[in-house]
Regions:
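Two-component system phosphorelay core
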Residues: 1-118
Length: 118
């Protein structure tokens, strides 16, 4: 993996070494799966569900994102969505919604780094 791309992914919160271990050391496989992340609609679904008060839809989308970020080793997003899901399940919807500005910033940073993969 190009050192500049690796540095960008790392700066965006991707634990590249952990992800490569998960993908059996295959940079090509990791790259292929990372490139699918920006196309996933779960973040848009989460945002829309929170705005509409659709609690079930929001929990499902946040839980999906938590899993995706765990599998791809996007650590800040995994931690954020893990916390958000816990808040949602505790019926603390105001706190869960209040996390969206930081989650959006972290999400956009990760997507930007992933798009640099080409």
């Amino acid at each position: 993996m190009d050192s500049q791309i690796r540095a960008g992914l790392t700066a965006a919160g991707v634990n590249v070494d952990e992800a490569l271990e998960r993908f059996m050391g295959s940079e090509a496989m990791l790259s292929r799966f990372l490139k699918k992340f920006p196309a996933d609609q779960s973040f848009a679904i989460l945002t829309a569900a929170l705005e509409a008060g659709d609690h079930e839809g929001a929990v499902n989308a946040a839980h999906t994102l938590k899993g995706l970020c765990s599998n791809l080793s996007i650590r800040p997003l995994f931690a954020g969505f893990d916390r958000q899901v816990a808040l949602m399940r505790a019926d603390d919807w105001d706190a869960a919604a209040a996390m969206m500005p930081q989650l959006t910033e972290d999400y956009n940073r990760a997507v930007e780094a992933i798009l640099a993969l080409g």
